[in-house]
Amino acid sequence: MLRYSVLSSQTRLLSVSRQRTATQLLASNRITTGKRYYADPKNVQPTSPTPVSPESKSVIPPETVNSVTTTPTTQVQTSPPSSIQPPQPPVENPSTGSVPPPPPKRKGRFRRFLLYLILTSGIAYGGGVFAALKSDNFHDFFTEYVPYGEEAVLYFEERDFYRRFPNATRHSNRLPPIHKEESQRVTIPSKSGLSWKVAEEESDSGSLTQKGPHNSAVSASKDTTGAKAVTKAKEERAEKKAPAKKEAPAPAPQEETRTPAITPPTTLELVKVEHADEPVVQEVVRIFNDIITVISADEGAASKYAAPISRVRTELESIGEKIVSLRAEAQKAAKEEIEKAHALFDESAKKLMQQIETARAAEAAQFREEFEAEREKLSRAYQDKIQTELARAQELAEQRLKNELVEQAIELNRKYLNDVKELVERERDGRLSKISELTANVNQLEKLTTDWSDVIETNLKTQQLQVAVDAVRSVLENAASAKPFVRELVAVKELAADDPVVAAAIASINPTAYQRGIPTTSQIIDRFRRVAGEVRKASLLPEDAGIASHAASFVLSKVMFKRDAVTDGNDVESVLVRTENLLEEGNLDAAAREMNTLQGWAKILSKDWLADVRRVLEVKQALEVMETEARLQCLRVES
């Protein structure tokens, strides 16, 4: 724009200068032509009237004719003749001689503005897409507020995914075909009278390593199909019996008491891949969840595509686990490479010892991995066995309850028929008033049956809550290292959704504790011993310590004797000795209180250790509150 403005200003200046030059030349020409020398004849103005034009006959006076005269032909030429004609001076209009011509109009301003706007918008949009691919926070902002931002980011993420995984589309044809004839059949399964919600909650309270509704949606779809079939069969049966009721109104058996208390859901379970930090995995999970949501909107499609969706869900979860394991292996390999690179720059005297320690650490890591793999295998087998036993026991209990309810219903029907017969016989004698008493008795029996069903359901929920709390405690007690217990805690929260005490206990736990796990007692003791050495060194330093003071503190901390465990002093050494004894006794609360009495650098150095102990104590206290609440619910049910 600046360049075009400079050119336009230069054009204006040149046009004005040219106009002034032409005016000056014309004036000088007039002056030279108006001069008369003594040898020249006098210019005489014509006296005859001058016509305005050859075609018009009107005349004008001589005063209105321009005084421009021609040069006399007798003038002597002072320069050699030239073949180049001199430039003709521009003829100036008397009315507009002093007004400069208008400046040329600027053309293409709107086109340039539109071009720059498009280029700037394209560069900004491309930069936004690039930043959204790199930053999660900007990704959320860009896809939510920028038009077509989500489609653009999704397009580039898909291209990146297919570039990194070119063989990802090979597994698309592994799903078995679904026969339409089987999906259109209406069958009543053997367990159609049971509620699907109880089985799902019980599967959530078990082990996380086994297969269940949290890993596949097949069972949920089967239960949903069975419940829909039962509902449809009952509706057809009711339509067939409707004409008969109009003709002869007879008391029908109470079959409505056996219908499920909770209607089966028509939506499929969404995919939840744990530890899916990769954006590609997150995008695939989001797309698959959108597909599930669309399928769940249609009841027929939800039951039809339940099996393929469950298989795809299992594949996605296995892919997420593989990505997590690959990333962990890559981090471990990178860490080992860094340690080896640092080991090369150490002193030559320590090189042999470091190599020996590295080899020993590698062997220990290998043995530890083998031990962990074997322990995990045994734990998985044991959990599968326990889960199988629990499932069998639950099935037996439910079948027993179902049989008892059926027997009670049959007995009630038999009694009802007998009472009806007796009333019909007594009706002849004029005792129709007994019918109201019989109806009241039947209502009382129905109410009693309903109350017992509620008591049984409450008892089952209480038992499931107790099992879920025990699962959380077993994860914390049996873990050899810090292990997350998010799924167990989610199971407890789902089972105790209506209990404010359990919800408050779960909310009091620090999210870092159940996301990353809490350290075990042995880890706390080992870390305390390392922290105690640093605290002893810091306790010998004055406030303005120098290099000599640090060296003296290091030497004195090596030769300093430990005090007896029964000391009552408030110095750093006494506090450390008492804390170590309390940790060996298993009293973490008292040990944390002892370490909290330290002051200065000693307390600053032990701050992280105190934070870990505080998280462990908070988790244990929350578990105790949840166990107490579960026992209280059991007592309420029994009372």
UniProtKB/Swiss-Prot annotation:
Keywords, alphabetical: Coiled coil, Membrane, Mitochondrion, Mitochondrion inner membrane, Transit peptide, Transmembrane, Transmembrane helix
Highest taxon of source: Eukaryota
Major subcellular site: mitochondrion
Compositional bias ranges of the Pro residues kind: 83-92
Mitochondrial intermembrane side, ranges: 134-639
Localization terms from the record: Mitochondrion inner membrane
A family per Pfam: Mitofilin
Transit peptide extent on chain: 1-38
Function text: Component of the MICOS complex, a large protein complex of the mitochondrial inner membrane that plays crucial roles in the maintenance of crista junctions, inner membrane architecture, and formation of contact sites to the outer membrane. Plays a role in keeping cristae membranes connected to the inner boundary membrane. Also promotes protein import via the mitochondrial intermembrane space assembly (MIA) pathway.
Name of the protein in its database record: MICOS complex subunit MIC60
Gene: MIC60
